[in-house]
């Protein structure tokens, strides 16, 4: 793959259509999806020319942790729908490239297992549930697994109105 569209086409050819549409789709009329995607067309990557490239350093620091590159692997629910290793694969990739990744509280691999796979900085994305015991258990497990950051998701854990799926 040479660009985003190549990667998207490859995914569409390899994944069952319900899985592809889950990843590729969005809620309602997909207006925000189209805006987010088209925003990449508004960015120009302008190279610095006639400059040395011997010591290029794209590392950054976030939450007091050094990342080798300013790319973050965002948490996504039920990752094993998309790849047989799910969060394991993301943890390995983040570790290999020295960047941060997140694990959803709706993940398919335990926080304990993910923590053993990667020494990279990790974020636990937490959905608040009605069951306080479940909440406490998830938070304690993430803390014990040495997750660096907690992200509280405040929208909802119910699915959106995904019109593409209804069609």
Please name every model-derived segment.
Residues 16, 73, 94:
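Residue-level signature of catalytic and energy-coupling elements of molecular machines
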Residues 105-106, 154:
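Short secondary-structure boundary segments
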Residues 78, 91-92, 96, 113, ...:
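Alpha/beta enzyme core
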Residues 71-74, 99-103, 122-126, 150:
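Hydrophobic faces of well-ordered beta-strands that scaffold small-molecule active sites
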Residues 1-67:
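An N-cap/entry alpha-helix motif that binds or orients negatively charged groups
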Residues 59-70, 79-91, 107-119, 158:
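N-terminal active-site wall of soluble small-molecule enzyme domains
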Residues 72-84, 124-133:
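Active-site mouth loops of central-metabolism enzymes
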Residues 89-101, 105:
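Catalytic domains of carbohydrate-active enzymes, especially glycoside hydrolases
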